[in-house]
Amino acid sequence: MNAVPDGRSDKPRSVVGVLALQGDTREHLAALTEAGAEAVTVRRLRELEAVDALVIPGGESTAMSHLLREFELLEPLRARLAEGMPAYGSCAGMILLATEILDAGAAGREATPLKGIDMSVRRNAFGRQVDSFEGDIPFVGLDSSVHAVFIRAPWVERIGDGVEVLARADGHIVAVRQGRMLATAFHPEVTGDRRVHKLFVDMVSE
């Protein structure tokens, strides 16, 4: 691991990258820092190789897939996930972490699955941006509900063995965990509640 010493304790802080090709990178960097990680941006292969874990932010999943290819990160990222690198994806990040993407986009510009979590995810399942919504939902492992902000959000339609459902909204799966990989259909990085990011940072250290 590339963990760095934490000046507040003897426990090293995990170095968590945020994929910074497109999407709400800055909000995740702030949330991870407040959750106790050493947060850095990832745009190049050498930066991907230097982190202990990766956050794939919200944004546009087809654009992010295109940029992963352009920056020659798609296959190296798939390889690191297959090797067990912890990862957290929010919204578009959840879509990309799936093994199967439903309604993946127009031919030639599809969102490409990274195959990190054994699940099938439907893009924009809750509707267009004008149909975005928010609300409080129970979240397994947290002591109270989280305020979830959904923006053109996906939902999970299938999970494989070993995938734990952490939250649902309107009967649909919107948060899952498999091993040291986490995914949410909503955006905890925009609310000021750092518990989901703290959960992930703790997972990285497991």
From Swiss-Prot:
It catalyses: aldehydo-D-ribose 5-phosphate + D-glyceraldehyde 3-phosphate + L-glutamine = pyridoxal 5'-phosphate + L-glutamate + phosphate + 3 H2O + H(+); L-glutamine + H2O = L-glutamate + NH4(+). One of its GO terms (biological process) is glutamine catabolic process. PROSITE patterns: PDXT_SNO_1, PDXT_SNO_2. Its EC number is 4.3.3.6, 3.5.1.2. It holds the Pfam family SNO. L-glutamine binds at G59, E60, S61, R123, I151, R152. Pathway: Cofactor biosynthesis; pyridoxal 5'-phosphate biosynthesis. CDD domains: GATase1_PB (cd01749). The active site is at C91 (nucleophile), H187 (charge relay system), E189 (charge relay system). One of its GO terms (cellular component) is glutaminase complex. Keywords: Glutamine amidotransferase, Hydrolase, Lyase, Pyridoxal phosphate. GO terms for molecular function: glutaminase activity; pyridoxal 5'-phosphate synthase (glutamine hydrolysing) activity. PANTHER family: PYRIDOXAL 5'-PHOSPHATE SYNTHASE SUBUNIT SNO (PTHR31559), PYRIDOXAL 5'-PHOSPHATE SYNTHASE SUBUNIT SNO1-RELATED (PTHR31559:SF0). Belongs to the glutaminase PdxT/SNO family. In the presence of PdxS, forms a dodecamer of heterodimers. Only shows activity in the heterodimer. Catalyzes the hydrolysis of glutamine to glutamate and ammonia as part of the biosynthesis of pyridoxal 5'-phosphate. The resulting ammonia molecule is channeled to the active site of PdxS. This is Pyridoxal 5'-phosphate synthase subunit PdxT. It comes from Mycobacterium sp. (strain JLS). The gene is pdxT.
